[in-house]
């Protein structure tokens, strides 16, 4: 996965996700929308087969890089928890 920052301000971030589709972006969007620091978390892919999606994050005056990093860490923790539970269940 390649990421390209298209825009970065004090409270807004636009990132192009090269080669990604809905699965990861929906998960990231859902996690970000649970954060009270987030005003907008959305993405758009004009032509899903040909275009790379662009993710937009707007915060309440907080550095969007910190917010997206925190959300990514929560997602990683959730995946770790799932893996532990799964391994325990299939023993």
Curated annotation (Swiss-Prot):
GO molecular function ontology, one term from the record: DNA-directed RNA polymerase activity
Keyword Nucleus: no
Residues annotated as transmembrane: none
Keyword Nucleotidyltransferase (UniProt): yes
The protein's role, per its UniProt record: DNA-dependent RNA polymerase (RNAP) catalyzes the transcription of DNA into RNA using the four ribonucleoside triphosphates as substrates.
Domain of life: Archaea
GO biological process: DNA-templated transcription
Annotated localization: Cytoplasm
Quaternary structure annotation from Swiss-Prot or TrEMBL: Part of the RNA polymerase complex.
Family matches, as NCBIfam families: PRK01146.2-1 (NF002237)
InterPro entries: RBP11-like, RBP11-like_dimer, Rpo11-like
GO cellular component, one term: cytoplasm
CDD domains listed in its UniProt record: RNAP_L
Family stated for the protein in its record: Belongs to the archaeal Rpo11/eukaryotic RPB11/RPC19 RNA polymerase subunit family.
Protein name: DNA-directed RNA polymerase subunit Rpo11
Gene3D superfamilies tied to this protein: RNA polymerase, RBP11-like subunit
Catalytic activity reported: RNA(n) + a ribonucleoside 5'-triphosphate = RNA(n+1) + diphosphate
Endpoints of the signal sequence: none
């Amino acid at each position: 996965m390649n990421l390209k920052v298209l825009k970065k301000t004090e409270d807004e971030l636009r990132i192009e996700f090269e080669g990604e589709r809905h699965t990861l972006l929906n998960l990231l969007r859902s996690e970000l929308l649970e954060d009270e620091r987030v005003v907008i978390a959305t993405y758009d892919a004009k032509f899903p087969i040909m275009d790379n999606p662009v993710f937009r994050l707007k915060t309440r005056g907080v550095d969007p890089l910190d917010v997206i990093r925190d959300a990514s860490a929560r997602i990683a923790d959730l995946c770790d928890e799932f893996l532990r539970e799964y391994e325990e269940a299939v023993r």
